[in-house]
From Swiss-Prot:
The keyword Transcription does not apply. One of its GO terms (biological process) is photosynthesis. This is Cytochrome b6-f complex subunit 6. Belongs to the PetL family. GO terms for molecular function: electron transporter, transferring electrons within cytochrome b6/f complex of photosystem II activity. HAMAP family: Cytb6_f_PetL. Component of the cytochrome b6-f complex, which mediates electron transfer between photosystem II (PSII) and photosystem I (PSI), cyclic electron flow around PSI, and state transitions. PetL is important for photoautotrophic growth as well as for electron transfer efficiency and stability of the cytochrome b6-f complex. It holds the Pfam family PetL. Keywords: Chloroplast, Electron transport, Membrane, Photosynthesis, Plastid, Thylakoid, Transmembrane, Transmembrane helix, Transport.
Length: 31
């Protein structure tokens, strides 16, 4: 149970970092 929770937490963190990085890159290219 703990491994599944930590896995989903890691997946959510990776997704958030990727999306934030992608948005930052898009804003940089937009300007």
């Amino acid at each position: 149970m703990l491994t599944i929770t930590s896995y989903f937490g890691f997946l959510l963190a990776a997704l958030t970092i990727t999306s934030a990085l992608f948005i930052g890159l898009s804003k940089t290219r937009l300007i």
